A protein has these predicted regions:
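N-terminal lobe of the biotin/lipoate ligase/transferase fold
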Residues: 1-71
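Acidic, low-complexity central loop/insert segments
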Residues: 37, 59-62, 66-117
């Protein structure tokens, strides 16, 4: 299975600084074991897995986070990194809010003056 995988430094405006997170853009919803194995291989504090809900990006994305050893309920920097990936790859227009459906509820990210909130 081919998967788009990005490494994003959150809370940084200079490469190789900030808090890194891996972000996987998924076409299908793989099983939990596969996501855990990817997170172990990335060996970052968190790896985010995004899959689009419905037929349009505006319908939101399912978002899950895994550490190298377990799934976690919430991760701020990997959420911001996920929004960055959606906007920079053109999956979602920059002026649109990114909506993430997570185990912790609905999370939303927007941009303001070049920063992700």
């Amino acid at each position: 299975m081919a998967v788009a995988l990005y490494i994003v430094d959150a809370f940084a405006n200079v490469r190789f600084s900030g808090n890194p997170a891996a972000v996987c853009l998924l076409r299908d919803k793989p099983d939990e074991g596969w996501m855990q194995n990817v997170a172990m291989e990335m060996n970052l504090s968190e790896t985010a897995f995004l899959s689009q809900r419905g037929t349009a990006p505006e319908e939101g994305f399912d978002l899950r986070w895994f550490t190298p050893s377990a799934e976690v309920d919430l991760c701020g920097h990997a959420t911001l990194a996920s929004a960055h990936v959606l906007w920079t790859t053109g999956v979602l227009a920059r002026h649109k809010a990114a909506s993430f459906h997570t185990q912790s509820g609905l999370l939303t990210a927007t941009t303001d003056d070049g920063w992700i909130e």
